[in-house]
From Swiss-Prot:
The gene is ureF. InterPro entries: UreF, UreF_sf. This is Urease accessory protein UreF. Keywords: Chaperone, Cytoplasm, Nickel insertion. The keyword Iron does not apply. Required for maturation of urease via the functional incorporation of the urease nickel metallocenter. One of its GO terms (molecular function) is nickel cation binding. It is found in: Cytoplasm. The keyword ATP-binding does not apply. It holds the Pfam family UreF. GO terms for cellular component: cytoplasm. Coiled coil: none annotated. It comes from Rhodopseudomonas palustris (strain BisB5).
Length: 243
């Protein structure tokens, strides 16, 4: 057996203290265990299952791909990126504008509850566990309810966590929660759920990259069926989820 070692590459270099802290915080803040209540929301997916739009792993993958590329996934990424940059530039006017636009952009009352309840919980937990000098000022500048992606962008900026990593981690967390809801509703097994998550990797990366470069004028949704699902869920007779 050979005892020679492969040459060390840059990928094997250790993380800096700052990189390690950023990674640790992202893994914590966007973990399913972080108590923002994400497990209780399906973003209208519960109605899509009842209506027969989502019936198995392939149809769930297609539904979520559309939401990532043309709906809530991409739009939330844009809001996150613009909130992050506004905080980094200490531009309170821009931050307030993004915060107001993000809450106005959701298509239904339940989706509004979903994003603002998670945003509020996220801010409160981070404020108590990871206090930051600039966090209170940034939150106060918004002067109203915070959408979840705005809250994440705001917190990451005040803690100096890189934007690109934040975007990808956020979208991964959102998609993972959608898949978790789908697994309970369809239902799907654990292996099928992971196959869907693996299949969505390119879409998550692409949505994050596109959102990072997008302007607010690029915002828009073409997922009419998903928006309708979030509206019809409000009157769905039997429900497991709050949206």
């Amino acid at each position: 057996m050979s005892t020679s070692r492969a040459p060390e590459t840059t990928s094997a270099a250790p993380l800096s203290a700052e990189q390690s802290a950023s990674l640790y915080r992202l893994m914590t803040w966007l973990s399913p265990a972080f108590p923002v209540g994400a497990f209780s929301y399906s973003s209208g997916l519960e109605w899509a299952v009842e209506a027969g739009d989502v019936i198995d792993a392939p149809s769930l993958r297609d539904w979520l791909t559309a939401m990532l590329e043309h709906g809530a996934g991409f739009c939330d990424g844009v809001f996150l990126a613009h909130a992050y940059r506004a905080v980094a530039a200490a531009d309170e006017t821009a931050l307030r504008h993004v915060a107001e636009l993000a809450t106005a952009f959701v298509p239904s009352a339940e989706r509004h509850l979903e994003t603002t309840a998670q945003g509020k919980a996220f801010i409160e937990i981070v404020r108590n566990a990871w206090p930051s000098d600039g966090l209170a000022c940034a939150v106060d500048a918004c002067a109203g309810a915070l959408a979840y992606p705005v809250a994440v962008g705001l917190v990451s900026a005040t803690h100096g966590v890189p934007l690109a990593a934040t975007l990808h981690a956020f979208l991964h967390a959102v998609v993972s929660n959608w898949i978790s809801a789908g697994a309970r509703l369809v239902p799907l097994g654990q292996t099928d759920s992971q196959r869907v998550l693996a299949a969505l990797e390119p879409a998550v990366i692409a949505a994050g990259d596109r959102a990072r470069e997008a302007s607010l004028d690029d915002l828009g949704s073409a997922t009419f069926r998903a928006d309708l699902a979030s509206l019809r869920h409000e009157t769905q007779y039997t429900r497991l989820f709050r949206s």
